[in-house]
Amino acid sequence: MAITVGINGFGRIGRLVLRVALSRADIKVVAINDPFIAPEYAAYMFKYDSTHKAYKGEVSASGNKINIDGKEITVFQERDPVNIPWGKAGVDYVIESTGVFTTLEGAQKHIDAGAKKVVITAPSKDAPMFVVGVNEEKYTSDLNIVSNASCTTNCLAPLAKVVNDTFGIESGLMTTVHSMTATQKTVDGPSHKDWRGGRTASGNIIPSSTGAAKAVGKVIPELNGKLTGLAFRVPTVDVSVVDLTVNLKKETTYEEIKSVIKAASEGKLKGVLGYTEDAVVSSDFLGDERSSIFDASAGIQLTPSFVKLISWYDNEYGYSTRVVDLLQHVAKA
């Protein structure tokens, strides 16, 4: 029986989640809600993508629906989720991808509107967070609202888990060199809470805060309080990279670390954690479905217990793939 899905928020993640969902035989997206996007424009935005290129199938719009390869999807334009007729549309699961309704209280509106469960595509202050490949097995069916954490946490957590499980992490600092996102400015503009964040995205390297490293402690409790980090926003359109510098409890060699991560990428974490020794750059990972691709030739070691590890991620497509994976896991529980 198909998993019937509604998507709230048809931005970067919402549209890519739809692309991924359309490739899964057990998922049927029946409705989209976005108060700022009419059906005809939704069809256009889905079909044409400057980063991931045009959708190869047939896309059209008629009335309040869009049609993708013969599959009809109803488009709603409600500002308040409680007014979205999810129940009438037959939606059981909602992907909350507006970046607005990220708390239990906010996401509950979807359930009040007729949905059964909600997956939030952002970190949450109070909803339980799950990272596929790290802690999704802890999900229980009584949890109706869950968070897929952030794209950066999805990159960092699998790597941190493998390293911690084998060598133990005493403490660590993370830097993510992160591509531009929609919240940034095309030219200098007002940004009262984050002055640097108001500067031109395409012409600056912008230091920023991130809770991604601390969030790892929520999905890997034994690392709680042991990791923190920061971000640099850089003028690339997609694909980011994590720099994880850690003090290890157990002394080792960089070759042994590489071997352990490679084994994990070919075993339980295959499809989530990747491994490469090639001389790669960011654009080589556009469209990569994996959460984290360890760059074996980019890391360095200073002492037997102090190392810097580098891992790439498509912060749009890889993350959207994990959203759909988590949705499937929730539906099967």
UniProtKB/Swiss-Prot annotation:
Disulfide bonds: none annotated. Its EC number is 1.2.1.12. The record marks 178 as: Activates thiol group during catalysis. Keywords: Cytoplasm, Glycolysis, NAD, Oxidoreductase. NAD(+) binds at residues 12-13, 34, 79, 315. SMART domains: Gp_dh_N (SM00846). Pfam families: Gp_dh_C, Gp_dh_N. One of its GO terms (biological process) is glucose metabolic process. GO terms for cellular component: cytosol. D-glyceraldehyde 3-phosphate binds at residues 150-152, 181, 210-211, 233. The active site is at residue 151. One of its GO terms (molecular function) is glyceraldehyde-3-phosphate dehydrogenase (NAD+) (phosphorylating) activity. Its main location: cytoplasm. It catalyses: D-glyceraldehyde 3-phosphate + phosphate + NAD(+) = (2R)-3-phospho-glyceroyl phosphate + NADH + H(+). The keyword Oxidoreductase applies. It is an enzyme of class 1 (oxidoreductase). It comes from the Eukaryota. It is found in: Cytoplasm. Pathway: Carbohydrate degradation; glycolysis; pyruvate from D-glyceraldehyde 3-phosphate: step 1/5. Belongs to the glyceraldehyde-3-phosphate dehydrogenase family. Homotetramer. This is Glyceraldehyde-3-phosphate dehydrogenase. It comes from Komagataella pastoris.
